[in-house]
């Protein structure tokens, strides 16, 4: 049984050309990766399937639960093909967006094949092009034409991306390609599905109707309108990703750190794991060491209470994928050992509405710390019990025992949780004995240690966390389930 017990926060790494071989996947896993991300914006399905199979082989090799995250591309809002392939936009000049895929009659006409933008356009609205590098303001709205003033100019080429900050577009977050990719991923057996271009809570309902309970559903927060609807989006999702790249284009950069903290707090309140992503160690795409600002960025997300931090290009296409994971692993370790880490986590603990399951989970964390227990054991069929304990952020690992292999994998996204597939137990006495065996096999506790065991009775009833027991571990030879 492979157990990672050097830190509580988790690492997500994106697989790409630099990291897709079996040997590289193994190196990344041993360096600290907890979840592998398959980015369906790039690569063929056959390539993703091969990577998936290699991850599952790695899982068997190390007797570990490894999660696989499928990240769907989502709709891409782009300009069309310019009449001359390039347009130099000068600040203060006037341009026109025309509805269509190819350039119009005027030299400064830019094709925009997205009627939904024309439907919401109003004078004074800003459009951002090429990741925000070019900024224009709508001056006049005509039938099939938007007359704009260039605020920030530059050279524009074909099919550059367009962002419409502050507007909610009448567009589904799932394209035809996404729906096909989603079904492919679910058939493959992915554990998490990340939904791009989430604008409002109802987008999650549409996705849930397709995913069901076959995978955990992650809402990527990259639109300002999603921030306005964040509580309902968190409620309807299983996890949230703070996608700071697109979000940082659509809101002022100075607003991103505060919004990151708000999203993390909302997720912790709901006991849902939150991933902080984008450009965390971006310089390591081409450099063997990160900038000091990047190291501080990773540490800041850990201090904020993030469940996981994510590497994108660093591991997908970078020259130093293993080094990026190793450094991120060390940053997390150092941060979690810092004298200010625990006080900050405790000061930001959310005020949760009391219920018996929440009270038991919180008590388990507190009792374990008070007794100096090395581990909390959580029996869970759906993952809810372990998630509730994780929300309390106890200073010790949470060993989640579940009969479901997929639940075990998903739980490894949660702060402090070690998900392990275990035998199904049906009696109270059997649960106590099996917990003692499991913590010793995982090398998380030794004979004579006191451990805290949390479960719900009757067994296999989702959300029924109602029992807490402190047990002193007996020697393995003296443990036997009748």
From Swiss-Prot:
Coiled coil: none annotated. It catalyses: pyruvate + ATP = phosphoenolpyruvate + ADP + H(+). Substrate binds at residues 37, 245-246, 278. Induction: By tartrate. The keyword Transferase applies. It holds the Pfam family PK_C. InterPro entries: Pyr_Knase, Pyrv/PenolPyrv_kinase-like_dom, Pyrv_kinase-like_dom_sf, Pyrv_Knase-like_insert_dom_sf, Pyrv_Knase_AS, Pyrv_Knase_brl, Pyrv_Knase_C, Pyrv_Knase_C_sf. Its EC number is 2.7.1.40. Pathway: Carbohydrate degradation; glycolysis; pyruvate from D-glyceraldehyde 3-phosphate: step 5/5. The record marks 220 as: Transition state stabilizer. Homotetramer. Belongs to the pyruvate kinase family. NCBIfam families: PRK05826.1, PRK06354.1, pyruv_kin. This is Pyruvate kinase. It comes from Agrobacterium vitis. The gene is ttuE.
């Amino acid at each position: 049984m492979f157990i990672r017990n050097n830190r509580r926060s988790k690492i997500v790494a994106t697989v790409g050309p630099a990291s897709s071989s079996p040997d590289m996947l193994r190196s990344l896993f041993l360096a600290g990766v907890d979840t592998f991300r398959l980015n369906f914006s790039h690569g063929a399905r056959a390539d993703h399937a091969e990577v998936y199979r290699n991850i599952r082989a790695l899982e068997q090799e190390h007797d570990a639960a490894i999660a696989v995250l499928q990240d769907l591309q989502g709709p891409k809002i782009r300009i069309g093909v310019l009449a001359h392939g390039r347009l130099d936009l000068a600040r203060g000049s006037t341009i026109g967006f025309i509805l269509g895929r190819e350039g119009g009659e005027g030299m400064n006409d830019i094709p925009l094949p997205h009627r939904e933008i024309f439907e919401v356009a109003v004078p004074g609205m800003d459009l951002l092009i090429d990741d925000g590098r070019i900024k224009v303001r709508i001056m006049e709205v005509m039938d099939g034409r938007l007359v704009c003033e260039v605020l920030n100019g530059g050279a524009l080429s074909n099919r550059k991306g367009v962002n419409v900050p502050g507007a909610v577009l009448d567009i589904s977050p799932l394209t035809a390609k996404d729906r096909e990719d989603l079904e492919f991923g679910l058939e493959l057996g992915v554990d998490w599905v990340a939904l791009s271009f989430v604008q409002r809570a109802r987008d999650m309902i549409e996705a849930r109707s397709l995913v069901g309970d076959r995978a955990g559903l992650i809402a990527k927060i990259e639109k300002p309108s999603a921030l306005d609807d964040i509580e309902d989006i968190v409620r309807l999702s299983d996890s949230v990703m703070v996608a700071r790249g697109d979000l940082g284009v659509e809101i002022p950069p100075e607003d991103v750190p505060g919004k990151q903290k708000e999203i993390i707090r909302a997720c912790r309140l709901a006991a849902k794991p939150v991933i902080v992503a984008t450009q965390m160690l971006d310089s390591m795409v081409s450099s063997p060491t990160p900038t000091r600002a990047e190291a501080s960025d990773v540490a800041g997300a850990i201090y904020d209470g993030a469940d996981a931090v994510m590497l994108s290009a660093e591991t997908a296409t970078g020259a130093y994928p293993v080094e990026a994971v190793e450094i991120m692993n060390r940053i997390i370790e150092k941060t979690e050992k810092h004298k200010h880490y625990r006080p900050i986590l405790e000061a930001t603990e959310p005020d949760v509405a009391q219920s018996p399951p929440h009270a038991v989970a919180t008590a388990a964390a507190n009792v374990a710390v008070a007794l100096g227990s090395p581990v909390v054991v959580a029996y869970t069929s759906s993952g809810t019990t372990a998630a509730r304990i994780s929300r309390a952020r106890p200073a010790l690992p949470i060993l989640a025992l579940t009969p479901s292999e997929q639940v075990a994998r998903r739980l490894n996204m949660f702060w402090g949780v070690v998900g392990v597939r275990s035998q199904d137990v049906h009696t109270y006495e059997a649960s106590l004995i099996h917990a003692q065996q499991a913590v010793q096999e995982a090398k998380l506790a030794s004979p004579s240690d006191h451990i805290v065991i949390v479960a719900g009775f009757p067994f296999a009833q989702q959300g029924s966390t109602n029992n807490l027991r402190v047990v002193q571990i007996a020697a393995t030879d003296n443990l036997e389930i009748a």
